[in-house]
A protein has these predicted regions:
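Regulatory, non-catalytic segments
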Residues: 103-121
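Basic nucleic-acid-binding alpha-helical/helix-turn surface characteristic of O6-alkylguanine DNA
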Residues: 1-102, 148-162, 169-188
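Residue-level "edge-of-site" marker
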Residues: 94, 109, 125
């Protein structure tokens, strides 16, 4: 299963800077620190953790517990992802509008793809518009007809092979798993 891989969490002075499955993110962060940071960090760690530990961590982490490296625009997009919470999925175009950049859907999508802390910053909850349209169609059909025993739960919708939830840095299957976890978990 996609969740069985070794996950690496990079921390700088105790703050989460990246989550990945390879040490490339650590190298990227080291290059960024070397070229742009005036103050040297006291401690940089890269620790392997399990998927379950990441899921537990994301329930307790606060925005100030993270240290993000990116452009001002990228940080704005990542903050908006964080603020949107984990209770809904949005299309890229709807999310770009939420970011007050409706005309810049591609730029917003690119920033989403560069999210250094996926899973915790829920970039997986932004999906192609076609997926949203199909989900709405299923929900409308269910409301306008007699319920015929079809399971319209989140799990059933996520398992519908006709719905493409889009690309994800760790694969499509894990994206669906994360959507399922987030949408079926009660939020505080």
């Amino acid at each position: 299963m996609d969740t069985d891989r070794k996950w690496i969490i990079v921390r700088i002075d105790g703050k989460i800077a990246a989550i990945s499955t390879d040490y490339g993110k650590l190298a990227d962060i080291a290059r960024h620190i070397a070229s742009k940071t005036k103050e040297s960090p006291q401690e940089i760690t890269a620790t392997t953790i399990s998927f379950d530990e990441i899921i537990k961590l994301k329930q307790n982490v606060q925005w100030d517990d993270m240290l993000l490296f990116g452009t001002t625009f990228q940080k704005k997009v990542w903050k908006m992802l964080w603020d949107m919470g984990r209770s809904r999925i949005l299309s890229y175009s709807d999310f770009a509008e939420l970011c007050e950049n409706k005309a810049g859907v591609r730029a917003v999508a690119h920033a989403i793809g560069l999210n250094p802390i996926p899973i915790i910053i829920p970039c997986h909850l932004v999906v192609p518009k076609e997926a949203i349209d199909k989900i709405r169609g299923i929900q409308t059909k269910a409301q306008s007809t007699i319920f015929k025993g079809q399971d319209l739960s989140i799990k059933a919708i996520l398992e519908d092979p006709s719905i493409d939830f889009g690309e994800y840095v760790f694969g499509r299957k894990l994206k669906k798993t994360l959507i399922s976890i987030d949408l079926s978990t009660e939020q505080p």
